[in-house]
């Protein structure tokens, strides 16, 4: 009984081994047969080389028609007249200016409260989050225990206008105004101090408050 069982197991093992050997060889042979081309590719198998303008063959009547009927000229005139009656795509800058998004990131500014007190609490989150290390802050404690900045400098030549300072500020003190026209003649004029930033905030406060209100539902 044991001998019969052992012989049966050996036969099954031989069959499995044979199948494992046959299956890969059959598959590989089939792939090799169908993957190898039997002959040259058919005509037009590859994309032909595009012809140049001097190699294109055109009928004589087509050439004469384009020459005498001036079809290309009338086609260009039609395009010009079509664009003439459409509204213009351009504006007369700087006399006309396009709309600006409330999220536009322009010149920096420091805001105040309606009472005139500056908003910045010298938490230095903007200085820490600035990837360009363009912000420098120094602060001191007041008699009432509150902290206020004694120095707030921004090197506008380093700023990448990412808006991280504005997003990190817990009191909406440092913001980026909608002003994009602050080109200067010297590099020193782009080194903003606290007084310059506060004056920008006083100048653009109505626009800044409106932009913050428009963006408040999404914050």
Swiss-Prot record:
Residues 111-140, 150-179 form the 4Fe-4S ferredoxin-type domain. One of its GO terms (biological process) is mitochondrial respiratory chain complex I assembly. It is found in: Mitochondrion. This is NADH-ubiquinone oxidoreductase 23 kDa subunit, mitochondrial. Its cofactor is [4Fe-4S] cluster. Its EC number is 7.1.1.2. One of its GO terms (cellular component) is respiratory chain complex I. [4Fe-4S] cluster 1 binds at residues 120, 123, 126, 169.
């Amino acid at each position: 009984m044991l001998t019969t069982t052992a012989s049966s197991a050996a036969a099954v093992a031989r069959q499995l081994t044979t199948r494992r050997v046959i299956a890969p060889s059959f598959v590989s042979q089939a792939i090799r047969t169908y993957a190898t081309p039997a002959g040259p590719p058919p005509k037009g198998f590859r994309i032909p080389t595009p012809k140049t303008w001097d190699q294109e063959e055109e009928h004589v009547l087509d050439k004469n028609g384009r020459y005498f009927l001036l079809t290309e000229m009338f086609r260009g005139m039609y395009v010009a007249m079509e664009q003439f009656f459409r509204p213009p795509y351009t504006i007369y800058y700087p006399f006309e200016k396009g709309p600006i998004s409330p999220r536009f990131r322009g010149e920096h500014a420091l805001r105040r409260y309606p009472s005139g007190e500056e908003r910045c609490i010298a938490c230095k989150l903007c200085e820490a989050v600035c990837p360009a290390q363009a912000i420098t802050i120094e602060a001191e404690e007041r008699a009432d225990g509150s902290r206020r900045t004694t120095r707030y400098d921004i090197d506008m030549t380093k700023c990448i206008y990412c808006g991280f300072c504005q997003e990190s500020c817990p009191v909406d003190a440092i913001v980026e105004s909608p002003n994009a026209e602050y080109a200067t003649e010297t590099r020193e004029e782009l080194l903003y101090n606290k007084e310059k930033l506060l004056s920008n905030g006083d100048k653009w406060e109505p626009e800044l408050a409106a932009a913050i209100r428009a963006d408040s539902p999404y914050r």
